[in-house]
Design a protein with these regions (language model features):
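Transmembrane helical elements of multi-pass membrane transporters/channels
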Residues: 22-41, 142, 153, 176, ...
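Small-residue-rich hydrophobic transmembrane alpha-helices
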Residues: 53-113, 150-169, 276-340, 372-394
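Hydrophobic residues within alpha-helical transmembrane segments
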Residues: 25, 29, 59-62, 102, ...
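Short alpha-helical transmembrane segments in multi-pass integral membrane proteins
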Residues: 1-24, 81-148, 190-246, 302-368, ...
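N-terminal transmembrane alpha-helices
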Residues: 11-43, 47-48, 64-76, 80, ...
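Short runs within selected transmembrane alpha-helices of multi-pass transporters and secretion channels
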Residues: 74, 143-161, 169-177, 198-211, ...
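Helix-terminus/linker motif at the lipid-water interface of multi-pass membrane proteins
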Residues: 32, 36-54, 123-130, 186-193, ...
């Protein structure tokens, strides 16, 4: 009871800075650790050559689709589970947790099987050139099969977090990431296994994270049993899971689509461009995931304050989140822009074209990254306030609604520069849209506040 009261105090009455740090930082650290997987592979594989670096860049969006499946069931179930546990309905919560986990594994296995059968065609569609294809196949055959562990881990991460076991999720993520950092150079260079070694290192790291979650469950530390007997999907249960899970999956698919479109456009200019853009994607993802993680802590505060009609608290949460996230984005963006040459040089053996391409794109992405915090605060805010359609649209702008037309059209008129600057241009358009939607939202909030005040005076 005390723990539940403490959580309610954080959401409803604790100072905003304290509440944001308590709720946002653990998730932010978890997201940052997750991003390390992608960056570490790229860093060590880069020493093998541009085609090898291009190979893991091409395979990357395929892995993101699988992660999306885990997020769909895990994130979708987590919200429902928290509500069920809150009202003491442990039996239904058990069934939901088991159904979400086994559904994600089942559908994940089907996607993995399909991907394995049609792997070469999928990689070609994702932008693999003739010189990249052999390395992409070698890496993907192992990586795709190991994604069954990734689906399990992502789903469990969200489900276990819903019962408040943040230390377990942190341990699973951290152990896997640290192991991957150690195993990559061992398999890639010492055992001379190249990209195959990178895939094996990632697979082993994911398996170890899976073992952490299995140990947690088998020692009966979880409030959920995860028994196969509890697997009982009903229409109402799946509707509750998927109404949150499907938008999450769509956002993840848009990320995969944007990377795939960049790879396909880059393939017209050679392996160096694919490798350079792949490095930029992984570098910028370190920053974006930190902001996403922090704002996961902002959302429940905003939603609670809005539901409780505490408009002053809501405005303070919005203002503080914008200041903090923009300050972070300003520092990270300037580092990416000012040191773009030095940063991108760490991901190649000295390929001058890759350095030139990566430096230009990273510089531009660094400048527009300064705007990312403002954009993400409002895309998160709309969802937190229950304005699903607006939140979904705004969330889809940066890598979907705005990005897809830009990456399809701009290279036709601007050549390779159209690829390098597609994401920064989409970012600027997305922020302009955000400004108009934010102004409209604040007018709505002011009207709602006046209505509450007039009702209280009657």
């Amino acid at each position: 009871m005390n723990e539940r009261n403490n959580k309610l105090e954080l959401l409803g009455s604790a100072p905003i800075p304290k509440a944001l740090m308590a709720l946002g930082i653990p998730i932010m650290i978890g997201m940052l650790i997750n991003a390390l997987y992608n960056l570490v592979d790229a860093y060590f594989v880069a020493g093998l050559g541009k085609s090898q670096m291009g190979a893991i860049s091409v395979v990357f969006p395929l892995g993101q689709v699988v992660v999306g499946l885990g997020l769909m069931f895990g994130n979708g179930a987590a919200s429902y589970l928290s509500r069920l546990l809150g009202r003491g309905d442990k039996d239904t919560a058990n069934r939901v947790a088991s159904t979400a986990l086994y559904s994600s594994i089942l559908i994940g296995a089907i996607i993995i099987l399909f991907s394995t059968i049609f792997l070469k065609s999928i990689l070609a569609m994702l932008g693999a050139t003739e010189t990249i294809m052999p390395y992409a196949l070698t890496y993907a055959r192992i990586y795709v099969l190991s994604c069954v562990f990734n689906v399990f881990n992502v789903t469990m991460n969200n489900i276990v977090s819903s019962e408040g076991a943040a230390k377990t999720t942190m341990c699973a993520l951290l152990l896997g990431a640290v192991l991957n950092i150690g195993l990559d150079p061992l398999f890639i260079y010492i055992l001379d296994m190249g990209v195959e070694g990178a895939a094996i290192a990632t697979a082993i790291s994911q398996m170890v994270s899976t073992l952490v979650y299995l140990t947690y469950v088998l020692r009966k530390k979880s409030v959920f049993t995860f028994s196969i007997k509890e697997f009982s999907p009903t229409r109402q249960m799946m509707a509750e899971i998927l109404k949150i899970g499907v938008p999450t999956l769509v956002f993840q698919l848009l990320t995969s689509l944007s990377i795939a479109l960049i790879n396909r456009a880059s393939s017209n200019y050679g392996d160096s461009v694919i490798a350079g853009m792949g490095a930029v994607t992984r570098i910028t993802s370190m920053g974006t995931l930190v902001v996403f993680g922090f704002l996961k802590g902002f959302q429940p505060i905003a939603g609670f304050s809005y539901g409780a009609k505490k408009f002053d608290r809501l405005r303070e949460a919005i203002k503080t989140s914008i200041i903090w996230s923009t300050s972070f984005c300003l520092v990270v963006g300037l580092v990416m822009a000012v040191f773009s040459m030095q940063i991108i040089s760490q991901f190649t053996k000295g390929d001058t074209q890759m350095i030139l391409v990566g430096q230009k794109s990273l510089f531009a992405n660094g400048i527009t990254f300064i705007l990312f915090g403002f954009y993400t605060v409002y895309s998160s805010l709309f969802l937190a306030l229950g304005k699903g359609a607006a939140g979904f649209f705004l969330g889809a702008c940066r890598q979907g609604v705005c990005f897809v037309p830009v990456i399809l059209l701009l290279p036709m008129v601007w050549g390779m520069n159209g690829i390098l600057y597609a994401q920064p241009i989409a970012d600027v358009i997305s922020v302009v849209i955000t400004v108009f939607m934010a102004l409209h939202l604040h007018r709505e909030l002011s009207m709602a506040e006046k209505q509450v005040m007039s009702n209280s005076e009657m």
